[in-house]
């Protein structure tokens, strides 16, 4: 059963805070294991990655070259799709590409009053690695959401890793990689794949940034290699917060909550409303849906451990709670959803109106589904083209324009006791 809370309860603040508390990577033994894997991959390269892939994934590969897929294999997988699946995948890819094209940043410059040129140069990263969760239940949508923004950014080389338990792969993942323009694919996973991308091996080139979700070993490895390479984020369990008032279909709302609860036993689904009757209806609809849901066991554990039905006194109180949660996915199911969204400061993605289920955003709306979790929407953003670009400042002083700037730099450098700085500037105006 999903717990029911009311903001009028005396213990609500503490209970709600406890509900939100979750440590993504905080197991000393896990961190020790991951550190050892990374060290071994750095020392032994291909040999150790192959060994761990055979051990953990039971992959039948005899040599490292068996772990790399060819472009011909990707093309074959794409061409083997049924017309219906191919059209859906192409629609999703087209919409994702179109949305992310609007994010692409360009350089700029201007000449100041002193005649100096100042600006910013935008450059794509040279090479990126994308991690895609593997197995027969893997997600082609993750391929599109990670690879397409990199492609739009102008990244010339995209390396993808995806584990293949028992050597088996979801052909739709390969088709998505073909459609998204992935350069090379290796059927490896876990901390060893992250280490290989970060430091390189005899076969896998080192990348500049690693993106994509994975299990706790992957999350720990990404945290460990950060600094050697960039990363997108440390992904926690999936989250959804649904706020509803007025006329709503309780069955729709309940299924929206379960759409995230079915991901993982530690996923989080929270429903907030000022309408107690609607709260009752949603609670009942959840139980009815669970009776027929294939992943009911996972969803039931998720909502029992980390889910909640929350009764608030009004919309303003709900907004306070939403900003406290900073949810990965936020649905606003009411007539004034756009107006309410203006008061939301912290959320990964905001789905406005009764006809906008979170699932649309997962696949084909266009915006990225790689979103900040565990409250990190307070300070971070969805994955985007900007994650695959970097900026360099441009400064060019004219012979006359440098004089006043150099005098100021000279004075400030002296105050910081940096004599070489001061003299360097002074040479330009004396």
UniProtKB/Swiss-Prot annotation:
Chain positions recorded as Zn(2+) binding sites: 260, 263, 362, 421
Residues engaged in binding substrate: 238, 260, 263, 329, 362, 416, 421
Catalytic activity: L-histidinol + 2 NAD(+) + H2O = L-histidine + 2 NADH + 3 H(+)
Domain of life: Bacteria
Binding residues annotated for NAD(+), in chain numbering: 131, 192, 215
Annotated GO biological process: L-histidine biosynthetic process
Active-site positions on this chain: 328-329
Pathway: Amino-acid biosynthesis; L-histidine biosynthesis; L-histidine from 5-phospho-alpha-D-ribose 1-diphosphate: step 9/9
Cofactors that this protein relies on: Zn(2+)
Molecular functions (GO terms): histidinol dehydrogenase activity; NAD binding; zinc ion binding
Cofactor descriptive note: Binds 1 zinc ion per subunit.
Signal peptide positions (record): none
Function: Catalyzes the sequential NAD-dependent oxidations of L-histidinol to L-histidinaldehyde and then to L-histidine.
Listed name of the protein: Histidinol dehydrogenase
Gene: hisD
């Amino acid at each position: 059963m999903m717990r029911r809370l009311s903001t009028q309860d005396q213990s609500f603040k503490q209970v709600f805070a406890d509900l939100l508390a979750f440590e993504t990577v905080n197991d000393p033994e896990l961190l020790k294991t991951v550190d050892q894997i990374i060290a071994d991959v750095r020392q032994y390269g291909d040999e150790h990655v192959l060994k761990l892939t055979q051990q953990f994934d039971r992959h039948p590969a005899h040599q490292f070259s068996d772990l790399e897929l060819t472009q011909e294999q990707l093309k074959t997988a794409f061409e083997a799709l049924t017309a219906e699946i191919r059209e859906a995948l192409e629609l999703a890819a087209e919409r994702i590409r179109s949305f992310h094209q609007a994010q692409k940043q360009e350089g700029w410059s201007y000449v100041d009053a002193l005649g100096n040129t100042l600006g910013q140069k935008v450059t794509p990263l040279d090479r990126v690695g994308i991690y895609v969760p593997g197995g027969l239940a893997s997600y082609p949508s993750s391929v599109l959401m990670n690879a397409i923004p990199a492609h739009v950014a102008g990244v010339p080389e995209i390396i993808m890793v995806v584990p293949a338990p028992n050597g088996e792969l979801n052909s739709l993942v390969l088709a998505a990689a073909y459609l998204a323009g992935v350069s090379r694919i290796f059927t490896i996973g876990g901390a060893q794949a992250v280490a290989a991308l970060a430091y390189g091996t005899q076969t896998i080139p080192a990348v500049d940034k690693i993106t994509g979700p994975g299990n706790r070993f992957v999350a720990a490895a990404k945290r460990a290699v950060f600094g050697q390479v960039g990363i997108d984020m440390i992904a926690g369990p999936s989250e959804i917060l649904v706020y509803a008032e007025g006329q709503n279909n309780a069955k729709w709302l309940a299924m929206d909550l379960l759409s995230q609860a079915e991901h993982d036993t530690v996923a989080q689904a929270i429903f907030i409303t000022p309408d107690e009757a609607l709260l009752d209806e949603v609670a009942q609809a959840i139980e009815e849906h669970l009776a027929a849901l294939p992943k009911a066991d996972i969803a039931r554990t998720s909502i029992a451990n980390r889910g909640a039905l929350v009764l608030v006194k009004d919309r303003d109180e709900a907004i306070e709670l939403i900003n406290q949660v900073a949810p990965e996915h936020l649905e606003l199911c009411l007539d004034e959803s756009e107006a309410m969204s203006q008061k939301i400061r912290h959320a990964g993605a905001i789905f406005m109106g009764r006809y906008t289920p979170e699932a649309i955003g997962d696949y084909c709306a266009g915006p990225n589904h790689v979103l900040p979790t565990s409250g990190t929407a307070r300070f971070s953003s969805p994955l985007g083209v900007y994650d695959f670009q970097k900026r360099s400042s441009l400064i060019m002083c004219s012979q006359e324009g440098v004089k006043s700037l150099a005098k100021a730099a000279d004075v400030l450098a002296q105050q910081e006791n940096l004599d070489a700085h001061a003299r360097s500037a002074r040479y330009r105006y004396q």
